[in-house]
């Protein structure tokens, strides 16, 4: 699918299967989400540009690669997106963090915005927007709309699961934003949940209903 990368690493798929099980506990779900987010982050950042820097090792001077220019912003779509942040920040602790408050109205399935906080220089950084689920796509579309209003243009979207309907809507709204996901599931049900899915990621992560 154009503009969509499915990260099918065996460890990603193994951990995702355990997360899907309905009997997986809240604590295990949260731990697995942190672990899998590190693996996903590795893939979504694999083409970052490097520059050479002269350094001193204990033995000699050498030229060694280092990330070039201003670095990353991880933009979490609240609240479930926060479950992906910890593992990603373990990998890139210098990344800035943005929080975007968007929730889905369960009656209309439309996004409701309530919070936005991002670094002032988002136009100069690579923004990786994270949310475990790309269902209808409405929340992620709204979040990226807000980032673009602030000048962001180098954006990627990372999720755990995606529905074909959500991908179609997302790509129509933001064809310039590549999508990275661990799985493209079958479809959305009448309530807008991804099927077979794993349920509500936020509820399973925080033990709420």
Swiss-Prot record:
Binding site residues for uracil: 194, 199-201
Keywords in alphabetical order: Allosteric enzyme, Glycosyltransferase, GTP-binding, Magnesium, Nucleotide-binding, Transferase
Cofactor(s) required, per the database record: Mg(2+)
Co-factor note (free text): Binds 1 Mg(2+) ion per subunit. The magnesium is bound as Mg-PRPP.
Molecular function, one GO term: uracil phosphoribosyltransferase activity
Activity regulation text: Allosterically activated by GTP.
Keyword Acetylation: no
Record-linked NCBIfam families: PRK00129.1, upp
Protein task: Catalyzes the conversion of uracil and 5-phospho-alpha-D-ribose 1-diphosphate (PRPP) to UMP and diphosphate.
Protein family membership: Belongs to the UPRTase family.
UniProt-recorded name of the protein: Uracil phosphoribosyltransferase
Species, as recorded: Rhizobium leguminosarum bv. trifolii (strain WSM2304)
């Amino acid at each position: 699918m154009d503009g969509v990368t499915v990260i099918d690493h065996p460890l990603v798929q193994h951990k995702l299967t355990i997360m899907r099980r309905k009997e997986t506990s809240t604590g295990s779900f949260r731990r697995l989400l942190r672990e899998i987010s590190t693996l996903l982050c590795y893939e979504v950042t694999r083409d970052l540009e490097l520059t050479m820097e002269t350094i001193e090792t204990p033995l000699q001077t050498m030229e060694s690669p280092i990330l070039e220019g201003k670095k990353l912003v991880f933009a979490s779509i609240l609240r479930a997106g926060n479950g992906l942040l910890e593992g990603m920040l373990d990998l890139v602790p210098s990344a800035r963090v943005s929080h975007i408050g968007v929730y889905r109205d369960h009656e209309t399935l439309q996004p409701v915005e309530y919070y936005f906080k991002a670094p002032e220089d988002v136009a100069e950084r690579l923004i990786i927007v994270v949310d475990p689920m790309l269902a209808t796509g409405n929340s992620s579309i709204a979040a990226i709309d807000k980032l673009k209003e602030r000048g962001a243009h180098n954006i990627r979207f990372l999720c755990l699961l995606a529905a074909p309907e959500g991908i179609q809507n997302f790509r129509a709204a933001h064809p310039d934003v590549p999508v990275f996901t661990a799985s493209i599931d079958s479809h959305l049900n009448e309530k807008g949940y991804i099927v077979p899915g794993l349920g509500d990621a936020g509820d399973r992560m925080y033990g709420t209903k």
